[in-house]
Amino acid sequence: MLTKKKWALFSLLTLCGGTIYKLPSLKDAFYIPMQEYFHLTNGQIGNAMSVNSFVTTVGFFLSIYFADKLPRRYTMSFSLIATGLLGVYLTTMPGYWGILFVWALFGVTCDMMNWPVLLKSVSRLGNSEQQGRLFGFFETGRGIVDTVVAFSALAVFTWFGSGLLGFKAGIWFYSLIVIAVGIIIFFVLNDKEEAPSVEVKKEDGASKNTSMTSVLKDKTIWLIAFNVFFVYAVYCGLTFFIPFLKNIYLLPVALVGAYGIINQYCLKMIGGPIGGMISDKILKSPSKYLCYTFIISTAALVLLIMLPHESMPVYLGMACTLGFGAIVFTQRAVFFAPIGEAKIAENKTGAAMALGSFIGYAPAMFCFSLYGYILDLNPGIIGYKIVFGIMACFAFSGAVVSVMLVKRISQRKKEMLAAEA
């Protein structure tokens, strides 16, 4: 699939993608310690995520201008090191407003400066027929890195007493890891050593100057962006499976952190290759795969609402939530792959990734706060059923958009073949 040199670069990009989000995603392994030692409610944790996402959304729009221009070596290494330094500040246990400030800056360092450039770098490693597998293995690699690093941080937390000192030690561990990766990126990554492999239409110099305008006018890219939007709106709800199992199923606190890691990271290792292989090898279309899985997600969420959770065994509840999460992670693995499937011009790929991220990750601006406040205002199982219902509506909307995208890509390919004839 890839040469040894490209596999080495792929591994480096995976290491970057698997470490930079450990601090912004601190809640995944340390949700309960965050509530206890940062003194935060469900809604306030949701607010921190929403502030982060607001800055991220604005940042993604701004990154449309530079994602194809600035050297990756500098933007990626700086973003990693800056993220680590913000983590060091978190160990001072800032107040609520300090938490909001740090999570806002995470939106700049992790998302605006790093993510679109990282996605473009991954996409350029393979041709248009390899995009599903490429992004699938990328998510798998991130899942492996995520899991190893997160469980290591949890071990550090336990080693230092599972209290305030352990929480600080866990944050220090995350911070030092991401700074180290930033230094490696700076000395190893070479912007000139990689040539784009995606078989796409080339454009002349005049077109390059208007790539942003042409991206904004491309209906296919907008449909891809909204596909990502609805996947991510459902994905945001996975975070609240953690308090769901603790409050409804009375999951022991010792297992809450481990479940959070499995829910957010281990599922990437399962979902990544499954989503990539099915979309490329069986359906031969990432957009069709997203369509089918949106339909399955809608049905699964309706079933989740109807189940008698209060009388079910805890391990059955864990199996149900993890099973649904696996479906969502197969979608996350390939939701940018339609950009390669649609053969978007190479000089527009970075801008297309930025626009897709700008629209696609927008749910995090409001979903975390929305879900958190619903749970705070509706204690018990009823709050979770409301959240699951909203997630089902997002999944159904995603199915509708996916049908439109499949038709659009098919039409686009026919037009390109006609133009070449």
UniProtKB/Swiss-Prot annotation:
Gene3D superfamilies, per the entry: MFS general substrate transporter like domains
Localization per record: Cell inner membrane
TM regions (residue ranges): 45-65, 74-91, 96-118, 147-167, 169-189, 221-241, 242-262, 289-309, 310-330, 355-375, 386-406
InterPro entries in UniProt: MFS, MFS_dom, MFS_trans_sf, OPA_Antiporter
Principal location class: membrane
Intervals, Periplasmic compartment: 1-44, 92-95, 168, 376-385
GO cellular component terms, A-Z: plasma membrane
Mode of membrane association: Multi-pass membrane protein
Cytoplasmic side: 66-73, 119-146, 190-220, 263-288, 331-354, 407-421
GO molecular function, one term: transmembrane transporter activity
Domain of life: Bacteria
A family per Pfam: MFS_1
Record-linked PROSITE patterns: MFS
Keywords: Cell inner membrane, Cell membrane, Membrane, Transmembrane, Transmembrane helix, Transport
Induction: Down-regulated by cystine.
Family: Belongs to the major facilitator superfamily.
Protein name from the UniProt record: Inner membrane protein YihN
Native organism: Escherichia coli (strain K12)
Higher taxonomy: Bacteria, Pseudomonadati, Pseudomonadota, Gammaproteobacteria, Enterobacterales
